[in-house]
Amino acid sequence: SSSGLISMPRV
């Protein structure tokens, strides 16, 4: 999930 400015791809 994307948190603020940082988007973490769920793999």
UniProtKB/Swiss-Prot annotation:
It comes from the Eukaryota. Its main location: secreted. Pfam families: Periviscerokin (PF08259). The modification Valine amide is found at V11. One of its GO terms (biological process) is neuropeptide signaling pathway. Keywords: Amidation, Neuropeptide, Secreted. GO terms for cellular component: extracellular region. Mediates visceral muscle contractile activity (myotropic activity). Belongs to the periviscerokinin family. This is Periviscerokinin-3.
